[in-house]
């Protein structure tokens, strides 16, 4: 028996399970969106991260990597148990056709499993839904979890898509907006001005000079002179 799984998020650069074959390609009718909450890897329940899920889009394609697991039911079971724990925020497993670049019309593999999510906040508590780019960028720039921060997840995906030769405008645009948020945040941090030794000595000397009010009460003749 053979099991195929399509990865379009962190699985692309970090599958984390034993597989026998890896193939670059794409699926049709879906686009990648950052509309799913992650509360146990790159975020927390109080401050969820935004991670990838798929949204149906008739003319869209989504590039990624298909992983093949061969060796019988036990090997497939172990791989799937790992994936279900890891992809626990995804409430659906969808069967799709997988295409390779050299033949974009004929499926290279059918029945490929892909983890997706129901786009409904009522039936799927992890579904965040779309948001303005700036709002998503602020959330991604600040979310952190046990496995790292949310921005690294996005930047690693951006790099992975570049490495496989299929950069995605949406991912690049979101990553650049996160960089903008991080840059703005760093400029708001004011670094205290360090006083030079010469300035400290001068200020100390200035502070040690007694004022007229400190001198005059002890010298009545000085009072008469000033009057």
Swiss-Prot record:
It comes from Arabidopsis thaliana (Mouse-ear cress). GO terms for cellular component: cytoplasm. Pfam families: ChaC. The active site is at 87 (proton acceptor). Its EC number is 4.3.2.7, 4.3.2.9. GO terms for biological process: glutathione catabolic process. GO terms for molecular function: gamma-glutamylcyclotransferase activity; glutathione specific gamma-glutamylcyclotransferase activity. InterPro entries: ChaC, GGCT-like. Binds 2 Mn(2+) ions per subunit. This is Gamma-glutamylcyclotransferase 2-2. Converts GSH to 5-oxoproline and cysteine-glycine (Cys-Gly) dipeptide in vitro and plays a significant role in glutathione (GSH) homeostasis. Has no activity towards gamma-glutamyl-L-cysteine but possesses low activity towards gamma-glutamyl-L-alanine. Its cofactor is Mn(2+). Gene3D superfamilies: Gamma-glutamyl cyclotransferase-like. It is an enzyme of class 4 (lyase). The keyword Lyase applies. Substrate binds at residues 5-10. PANTHER family: CATION TRANSPORT PROTEIN CHAC-RELATED (PTHR12192), GAMMA-GLUTAMYLCYCLOTRANSFERASE 2-2 (PTHR12192:SF19). It catalyses: an alpha-(gamma-L-glutamyl)-L-amino acid = 5-oxo-L-proline + an L-alpha-amino acid; glutathione = L-cysteinylglycine + 5-oxo-L-proline. Keywords: Cytoplasm, Lyase.
């Amino acid at each position: 028996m053979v099991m195929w799984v399509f990865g379009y998020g962190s699985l692309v650069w970090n599958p984390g399970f034993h597989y026998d074959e890896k193939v670059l390609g794409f699926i049709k009718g879906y686009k990648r969106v950052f509309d799913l909450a992650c509360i146990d890897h790159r975020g927390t329940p109080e401050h969820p991260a935004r991670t990838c899920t798929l949204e149906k889009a008739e003319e869209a394609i989504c590039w990624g990597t298909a992983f093949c697991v061969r060796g019988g039911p036990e090997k497939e079971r172990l791989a799937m148990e790992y994936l279900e724990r890891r992809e626990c925020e995804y409430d659906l497993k969808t069967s799709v056709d997988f295409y390779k670049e050299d033949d974009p019309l004929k499926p290279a593999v059918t029945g490929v499993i892909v983890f997706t999510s129901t786009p409904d906040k009522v039936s799927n508590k992890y579904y965040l839904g779309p948001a303005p780019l700036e709002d998503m960028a602020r959330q991604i720039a600040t979310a952190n979890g046990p496995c790292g921060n949310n921005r690294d997840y996005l930047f690693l995906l951006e790099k992975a898509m570049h490495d496989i030769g299929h950069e995605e405008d949406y991912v690049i645009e979101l990553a650049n907006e996160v960089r903008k948020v991080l840059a703005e945040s760093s400029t708001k941090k004011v670094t205290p001005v360090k006083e030079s030794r010469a300035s400290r000595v001068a200020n100390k000397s200035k502070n040690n000079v007694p004022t007229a009010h400190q001198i005059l009460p002890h010298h009545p003749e000085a009072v008469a002179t000033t009057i």
